[in-house]
Design a protein with these regions (language model features):
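Conserved ATP-binding/catalytic motifs of P-loop helicase motor domains
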Residues: 1-345
Length: 345
């Protein structure tokens, strides 16, 4: 009934208001109140007293120092397991915000020990617990014990697996040379030997990297690939990481281009604080080929979403300059792919 709805709304507003007062008294961001109430309802204050470090979760994104001060006000011991584990996860997340997908175990232990002013043995015990609980993944990378947040470990594994699946050759049209000639004529220019080879490769490979600095002819190659794919009846979409890059891509190719987020139809879930995408394995992109420009700016999470949205046989052309702006998020993917030597470049 309407009366019941009004009563529930009043209780919710009163609860949020009390929570705002509680957070303000303890010098915590009052804007966290709505999210906390959404999860814990009227028990939110009890939940915070029980484990103040739940606020360090990315869903809340509270400052670690403020949460730590609040926890110590509640007289939680400095070596409390919840504090140690939260400190380790905070350092891992901090590392991600600086572009790294993992942190060596020794470095993570030292950084957390300094953050919490605790002995390394206590931190190592916390790291072991997190690993046993599945809240942190430890793997050997280049002889190091590497520590990951689970979602980044899984993303890295998926991208490696998918890239390897895409490195095989495709059957090229028997009249490929004449198709490339026609593409060249349609652009009214003469391809340099390397440009011609790159355009030919776009017919022979499922995955191709087109790289080079400014003025090296990447735009000519992209336009040539588009002209070739038109003749091969390969439906092609174009995307770039930012609005500005997508606009530039559209202008230089004369085709429609969009941001990767828009192409994948990104949706932000208020409940979880997570980004999701409409296009994935179950709803793949309606194309036979995708050309991505400014790939150096694509981070690990976005590349994972992009690869999930491609049909199994969809071609992928990654274009960019590894010396240009790196991705804001974790993972220097484009440069790593070039360095690996596993992808045709």
């Amino acid at each position: 009934s309407k009366a019941a709805e009004m009563s529930a709304s009043f209780r919710r507003q009163s609860g949020v208001r009390r929570l705002i007062e509680f957070l303000t008294i303890h010098r915590l961001p009052p804007e966290l109140a709505v999210r906390l109430y959404r999860i814990y309802g009227p028990d939110a204050q009890d939940a915070l007293r029980d484990d103040p470090y739940l606020l360090v979760d990315p869903y809340y994104g509270a400052d670690f120092a403020a949460v730590d001060a609040f926890a110590l006000e509640l007289e939680l011991p400095a070596d409390d397991e919840r504090r140690v584990e939260a400190g380790v996860l905070f350092e891992l997340s901090f590392n991600l915000n600086h572009g790294h997908t993992f942190i060596p175990a020794e470095k993570l232990c030292a950084a957390t020990a300094a953050l919490l002013s605790l002995e390394p043995e206590i931190i190592r015990a916390g790291m072991t617990r997190l690993s046993e609980q599945g809240r942190m993944v430890v793997d050997r990378v280049a002889g190091l014990e590497a520590c990951y947040l689970p979602q980044f470990y899984e993303a890295e594994e998926y991208v490696c697996r998918r890239i390897l699946q895409m490195t095989g050759e495709l059957e090229a049209p028997s009249n490929l040379e004449s198709l490339v000639d026609r593409a060249e004529q349609s652009q009214s220019l003469t391809y340099a030997a390397q440009q011609r080879e790159a355009i030919r490769m776009a017919a022979q490979r499922q995955l191709l990297i087109v790289t080079g600095g400014p003025g090296t002819g990447k735009t000519t190659v992209m336009s040539g690939i588009l002209a070739l794919y038109d003749q091969m009846k390969v439906k092609t979409l174009l995307a770039a990481p930012t609005g500005r890059a997508a606009k530039r891509l559209a202008e230089c190719t004369g085709r429609e281009a969009s941001t990767i987020h828009r192409l994948l139809e990104s949706q932000f879930d208020e409940e979880t604080g997570m980004m999701s995408f409409f296009h994935d394995e179950d709803e793949p992109l309606p194309c036979d080929a995708l050309i991505v420009d400014e790939t150096s700016m694509v981070d690990l999470q976005l590349m994972t979403a992009l690869l999930r949205a491609l049909k199994p046989k969809c071609r992928l052309i990654l274009v960019g300059d590894p010396d240009q702006l790196p991705s804001v998020g974790a993972g220097n993917l484009f440069a790593d792919l070039i360095r690996s030597g596993r992808v045709e470049t």
